[in-house]
Amino acid sequence: MEQWRQCGRWLIDCKVLPPNHRVVWPSAVVFDLAQALRDGVLLCQLLHNLSPGSIDLKDINFRPQMSQFLCLKNIRTFLKVCHDKFGLRNSELFDPFDLFDVRDFGKVISAVSRLSLHSIAQNKGIRPFPSEETTENDDDVYRSLEELADEHDLGEDIYDCVPCEDGGDDIYEDIIKVEVQQPMIRYMQKMGMTEDDKRNCCLLEIQETEAKYYRTLEDIEKNYMSPLRLVLSPADMAAVFINLEDLIKVHHSFLRAIDVSVMVGGSTLAKVFLDFKERLLIYGEYCSHMEHAQNTLNQLLASREDFRQKVEECTLKVQDGKFKLQDLLVVPMQRVLKYHLLLKELLSHSAERPERQQLKEALEAMQDLAMYINEVKRDKETLRKISEFQSSIENLQVKLEEFGRPKIDGELKVRSIVNHTKQDRYLFLFDKVVIVCKRKGYSYELKEIIELLFHKMTDDPMNNKDVKKSHGKMWSYGFYLIHLQGKQGFQFFCKTEDMKRKWMEQFEMAMSNIKPDKANANHHSFQMYTFDKTTNCKACKMFLRGTFYQGYMCTKCGVGAHKECLEVIPPCKFTSPADLDASGAGPGPKMVAMQNYHGNPAPPGKPVLTFQTGDVLELLRGDPESPWWEGRLVQTRKSGYFPSSSVKPCPVDGRPPISRPPSREIDYTAYPWFAGNMERQQTDNLLKSHASGTYLIRERPAEAERFAISIKFNDEVKHIKVVEKDNWIHITEAKKFDSLLELVEYYQCHSLKESFKQLDTTLKYPYKSRERSASRASSRSPASCASYNFSFLSPQGLSFASQGPSAPFWSVFTPRVIGTAVARYNFAARDMRELSLREGDVVRIYSRIGGDQGWWKGETNGRIGWFPSTYVEEEGIQ
């Protein structure tokens, strides 16, 4: 038997792969095993299974999706533990790219074989490999795997469940249904049951399971929380039990309301669920912190004998020790995701009931709640990934979460339109920007932040050719990112045509998120937005889900909406003059731009109108005392708000002036960094009480150079002269700008050490808005730990990655139709893995794996992807 097949069987014996994984199929090829291991998740699981506690689960990215960064981090984590904990030498291991790019899969097999021969593995009683002579020619077996890797995605689906979720359901059934199963079975076995009988049966199940659930919560509080307060710090208590006390209070009231409703026939039960929808939102916090709770609990059990003994003592008091604390903490998440299923069953037996319509509304409310909770969990995981990106990029002075959700990352070659040199770069694509970096070992040096709002993407068909050199393929598949106002653009080159297609698709999706087609429907001006409080969509009334950039907000009237609902939102109540042109409103006076304006600073709560020096605008609205005016570009007809100080009246003939106005003619008083006339000593006194990175631009009227930058850095205030010469402005000859504004915007993102080696800081905090910036930062701090699905580890600590016999999540399989459904609502995909729906679309369902997380996989209109299961109605199911 080939060595790679023996490796696959050994991984099955270690409970890393399921028994019927494709690697044991007669048709299997070595790439099937390579594909299963490429993201590093299963290798990390292997170490955990061999030696629980040897690997810190917080270091594993269980769903790396399309991220090369996260896959390589997993592989490096595996290699480090192999070296540090299992004693393997570096020469016995492999380079991360040997696996990720499948450059040398033979080395990977060899390293896994050495693990199988380790005493830790031997003590498990698992037969090592190779256990027999192999006759394969390694070079032949592993040849061309790197090309296959270029052509195939890692086969992980972000919405797939993990196998232990079934185990979680088993625990839930044991704990919650243990008392009602037999009565229910006897009830259902009666002959001639009417619909009312079945309805009463459903009511009984809702009532009794809720009562049992509430008793379970009380058991946790009485038998675990109270005793453990004596041995745990408040911080550890909060980490393990999260907001369980709040859940208990809510369910005390919820159970009483259910009891009252069922006692009078259940006709008001729908209203009970509708009334409690908002209060049940606290499950978002509970579910999203479950991973951290489980990890904290496991670490405390492993490190503190007094705590372990106390927990064992507490366990014996709860149902005779049948369930561990780890089991019980799972139950709340399972329970809240069951409510819509219970109501769906009740609705199916309430066809003739007068409260049927309200039951439908209650069902939709609980489906919406389940989706909200799942999206909060998903966003917590996303924020954790963003945090890892953040910590790995040097010179990055902005919070990556401000740029939306990550789409894809990886290595491309980049060439700017100005600089024609093709350079190796690592790209992180987000909804709003693409971060261009240079790789430095395991970290990255920031080179450029490209804002997608000001760019468009075009194909480069001239470079679509497969050119090979003696040492491999050239990166010859290209596309462009072109600046909308004619500034510097970029050309990107991919290794394969398939890689180019994926990158272009992700760019298109990101751009559609930040600039939706219907953003200005019905005179609104919608922008992607993070809502501080739970908000309902103005159109469909359902939650805007998640924890950041949950949807879109109109900058005029402030209403929120899903992406798919933008076109059906009622007309904006604050219609601007630009929207009334059709009704005969004439254009205002023409103005000419005295400087470039790229949206920084941004008008508070208003859409931005960007322009360049010399552009002509029509003034639509402008109070002489206001720092912000509304206008419209004559050439493009785009409208929005801009600093009133950046324009001046156009000459009578309507033509803009030829030359760029000098900085002395521009009024910068509207900007939070401009201090006006200020002496050096006065500046020192002003800035010394501020945080490092706080800066201002001041005028030096008595000096040859009019402006100076003053910035606090490492407890000192530094001063930099701004030179104006030959119609350019700069602080170093190497980097020149059109205006002071452009110079400031550049050094807000790029370190001053480019010009002054000892000054490694950007222009962080404008001195006028320092307090406001600090307030915003504190209200938007990223989560310290985001949630992957905690059920990767079952309560017994068994395998957390096998997907089950039908369809492992890492495998590539031919879709099989298992049902059809009709879309009840519109749904706009935010990601290339998602499937957009229009109301009435017929969807062929390929997989319900992921249903507990709210997502199914299917096909409609020629596209395959994941969609919210609550947005469709299965045909044949009432």
UniProtKB/Swiss-Prot annotation:
Widely expressed. InterPro entries: CAMSAP-like_CH_dom, CH_dom, CH_dom_sf, DBL_dom_sf, DH_dom, GDS_CDC24_CS, PE/DAG-bd, PH-like_dom_sf. Residues 198-376 form the DH domain. GO terms for molecular function: epidermal growth factor receptor binding; guanyl-nucleotide exchange factor activity; phosphotyrosine residue binding; zinc ion binding. Phosphorylated on tyrosine residues in response to FGR activation. The modification Phosphotyrosine is found at Y142, Y159, Y172. One of its GO terms (cellular component) is plasma membrane. The keyword Zinc applies. Residues 405-512 form the PH domain. Residues 1-120 form the Calponin-homology (CH) domain. Keywords: Angiogenesis, Guanine-nucleotide releasing factor, Metal-binding, Phosphoprotein, Repeat, SH2 domain, SH3 domain, Zinc, Zinc-finger. A zinc finger (Phorbol-ester/DAG-type) spans 523-572. It comes from the Eukaryota. One of its GO terms (biological process) is signal transduction. Interacts (via SH2 domains) with the phosphorylated form of EPHA2. Interacts with SSX2IP. Interacts with NEK3 and PRLR and this interaction is prolactin-dependent. This is Guanine nucleotide exchange factor VAV2. The lineage of its organism: Eukaryota, Metazoa, Chordata, Craniata, Vertebrata. The gene is VAV2.
